[in-house]
Structures are given as structure tokens and as C-alpha cells.
A protein has these predicted regions:
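Actinobacteria-biased recognition of intrinsically disordered, low-complexity terminal regions
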Residues: 1-19, 390-394
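Active-site phosphate/pyrophosphate-binding segments
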Residues: 18-30, 37-49, 54, 177-298, ...
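Glycine-rich phosphate-binding loops that contact phosphosugars or nucleotide phosphates
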Residues: 54-199, 312, 319-323, 330-337
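A structural-propensity feature for long, helix-poor, extended segments
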Residues: 104-111, 115, 278-313, 322-329
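Glycine-rich, charge-decorated loop segments at or immediately adjacent to ligand/cofactor-binding or catalytic sites
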Residues: 138-148, 265-268, 354-358
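C-terminal hydrophobic structural anchor segments
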Residues: 304-364
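Short, small/acidic-rich helices and loops at N termini and domain boundaries
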Residues: 379-394
Length: 394
């Protein structure tokens, strides 16, 4: 039996308050404020001193868990024009080439995540420049201080790295801009904050589901086994974040991919048992839907495969590559429709790549949170994750 979300519960303030014990929706709505505050905190901490103000030979970023996307975003933004390579590491071992000429960025909201902390400590031992982002008075801050690096403290009160993404990402983007690795200075960051504010307003809890894009998306996602697909590198990062949020926040297992590489992999799943006409040869008996089934009492008979397509804004400079990418996206969507896959699309609005990405992340973050609440779950509290930590705490 597939999950089912009654849109009435998403329009009930009491239901939302009862299940959102740690105010995840409120925290997500502060994303724009996080950007503005992080700019101020970065300037106060001396962000211009990163790597001694000199361009490093390379940049390595360590982040994981809810902040994993920080490394992915920097890699995405820097790749087109960065004069130095940017790489990602989640844990040790640190590559052998990292040394005094390189910059290592370690991100952890608590300042205690083992991977980034170990990477920062090893980088400091080798004499690399350090930029760390996380809690003040934390082990990560101490490692950075001993290495005479720059530590950007996040504002107090943040309890979840998933909901504090922009407090963690903004200093890293600003530092990369200062070093000439990408073009995303304060003007772009303030524009990003404004875009995040617009999405927070559109996705606010008291907005009815028929006008709230995140609630509407959550209702559609509820009865599916979701596959999140980005139409290119930018939305590939957004897709990875969305799949993570669906799994960790809404407790719905989700996979993700990026076009063009994942096209065959994703489309092959349309032949499987979770599509209306799929499952040929899979040992699944096909039958017509029960017209007497009550969705409130019986629930949907079987979860359907769902394709959440994240699409970029139309290109302002037409090219053959852009036309081919759009044609491939359209072909995947048509194939999904023909196979009986439930298709959902989130289209980015025009703007700087970081601004476009912010909008995509905001909408899917809110949708995953509403999906958890609609299913009667607390988006911030997972008993099984708590059990896992208890069993592995050494």
C-alpha cells in the first residue's frame, strides 16, 4: 500500500505545529536571512585573509551529511572558469598532493563531524591554508586557530545542517569569489537571499495547498517512488540535494541522476514493475485500478514510479548544446508519460546560476518537509537514526 497525504492536513496549522517539533519550516524560511547574516559574519572574521589573500594552487572541500551539498555547489560554480582545480573529499585520506600551496575548506555545523574535522587536522599538519565553517568554540574552530586559518562561526541556534545550508554555504562562496575562483560576490549573494525570501513566502505554512508549490509537490510525491533527475550540472546538484532531503527528511527512499549521463539508467527503470504498463516479464500481474477503492481507507494499491524533473531556465544564448539538452529532457519526459510514470517538473527562474540553484533547492526542501509532516512524521527527528548513533557511539 502506497503512502497517502490528505491535503487537508497540510492546510491545518495545528497538525503542522504538532509534527514540526523543531520548527524545520521556520528554519527553512530563514534561508535568505542566513545568507545576509553569513556575509556579515564572514566579513567580521576576515574572509579576505583566506590563503593569505593569494590564489591557492588548488582547493579541496570537505563536507558531508546535511552539508554535503556545500562542496558540490562550489565545484559546480567554479568548474566553468576557475583557474585552479576544485575537488571534493568527505573524509581521510587526504590526497598526497595537498600541501602548503593549497587551500582546504572544511564545513561542519557542529564543528565535530569526523570527516571534515580529520581532513582539516591533516591539512593543518601539512601546512595547507585552512578555511573552516561551523560552530564557534568547537574542535573544528580549534584546529583552524592552531593552523592560523580563517574560521567562520555560524549563528547560534541552528540545530540541523539541512536547515542551515545557507549559513554554511555563503562563506565558502564568498571566499571563492575573493580568491577569483568564481563570480558570485555580495551582489549575487544578496540576489540569492531575495530569491530565497520569495520562495519562503510562496511556501509558507499558512498558504493553501492549491497555491503553495511545495505543498502541491509534496502531495504528488507522496504516492510515488521518486526518481529526481536534473537536466544538467546545475540541476544535477539540486537533484542530489532533493533526493537526500526526501530520504532523510521525508523518509521516502529516492534516487537521483543528471542528464545526459543518467538518461539510459533512469529510462530503463520505466520498464520495471512500478509503472502502469511496466513489469513485462517481471512476474507482476497487471490489473485495472479498483474503481471502488477508498483512498482514505484503503490507500493507493501500489506506489507508482515518480519522475521529478528539475529543469533550468531557458538559455538566453541559444546554442546547439542547449538545444540538444532540451531535446533530451523532452524525450525523457515523453518516454516517462508513455510508460505511465507520474511526472512532476520544477522549473528554475532566470538569474545567476547560484540564484537559480537556490530557488530549486528551496522548493524541494520545503516539499520534502511538507511530505514528512503530511505523512505524520517529524521532519527533524528520526528514531532509527537516533538508534544508529546509540549503537555506533564509541
Amino acid at each position: 500500500m502506497a503512502p497517502y497525504v490528505d491535503e487537508a492536513v497540510l492546510n491545518d496549522p495545528e497538525h503542522i505545529a504538532a509534527h514540526d517539533s523543531r520548527d524545520t519550516l521556520v528554519a527553512l524560511a530563514t534561508a535568505g536571512a542566513q545568507v545576509r547574516q553569513a556575509i556579515t559574519l564572514s566579513r567580521e572574521a576576515g574572509i579576505e585573509r583566506v590563503a593569505g589573500g593569494d590564489r591557492p594552487r588548488s582547493v579541496l572541500v570537505a563536507s558531508l551529511g546535511g552539508s554535503a551539498v556545500v562542496a558540490n555547489v562550489l565545484e559546480l560554480l567554479a568548474e566553468p572558469g576557475s583557474p585552479v582545480p576544485v575537488s571534493v573529499r568527505r573524509n581521510l585520506p587526504l590526497p598526497g598532493w595537498v600541501g602548503p600551496l593549497d587551500l582546504v575548506v572544511a564545513v561542519s555545523l557542529s564543528g565535530r563531524a569526523r570527516g571534515p574535522l580529520a581532513v582539516a587536522a591533516e591539512a593543518a599538519r601539512r601546512g595547507a591554508s585552512l578555511l573552516t565553517v561551523g560552530a564557534a568554540d568547537s574542535p573544528l574552530a580549534e584546529v583552524c586557530a592552531r593552523a592560523r586559518g580563517v574560521h567562520i562561526a555560524v549563528a547560534r541556534g541552528a540545530t540541523s545542517s539541512r536547515a542551515a545550508l545557507w549559513s554554511l554555504l555563503t562563506p565558502v562562496v564568498l571566499a571563492a569569489h575573493e580568491l577569483g575562483l568564481l563570480e558570485a560576490g555580495e551582489a549575487v549573494l544578496f540576489e540569492t537571499a531575495d530569491r530565497l525570501d520569495l520562495h519562503a513566502e510562496a511556501c509558507r505554512p499558512r498558504s493553501e495547498s492549491f497555491v503553495n508549490p511545495a505543498k502541491a509537490l509534496a502531495i504528488q510525491l507522496a504516492e510515488t517512488i521518486p526518481v529526481v533527475l536534473g537536466d544538467g550540472p546545475l540541476n544535477g546538484v539540486a537533484a542530489s540535494r532533493a533526493a537526500s532531503m526526501l530520504s532523510r527528511t521525508a523518509r521516502i527512499p529516492a534516487t537521483c541522476g543528471e542528464l545526459p549521463d543518467a538518461a539510459s539508467q533512469i529510462v530503463a527503470s520505466f520498464d520495471g514493475p512500478f509503472t502502469a504498463g511496466g513489469g513485462r516479464g517481471a512476474g507482476v500481474r497487471e490489473s485495472a485500478p479498483d474503481i471502488f477503492a477508498d483512498p482514505f481507507l484503503d490507500g493507493p494499491a501500489q506506489p507508482r514510479l515518480g519522475l521529478l524533473m528539475l529543469r533550468d531556465a531557458p538559455s538566453t544564448t541559444p546554442s546547439r548544446e542547449a538545444d540538444e539538452a532540451e531535446a533530451l529532457t523532452d524525450a525523457v519526459l515523453q518516454t516517462a508519460h508513455d510508460a505511465g510514470v507520474r511526472v512532476m517538473t520544477v522549473l528554475a527562474e532566470p538569474g545567476h546560476p547560484l540564484v537559480r540553484l537556490a530557488g530549486q533547492i528551496a522548493q524541494t526542501d520545503f516539499a520534502a518537509t511538507y511530505l514528512a509532516i503530511g505523512l505524520g512524521l517529524d521532519p527533524a527527528v528520526s528514531p532509527h537514526v537516533a538508534d544508529l548513533w546509540d549503537r555506533t557511539r564509541g
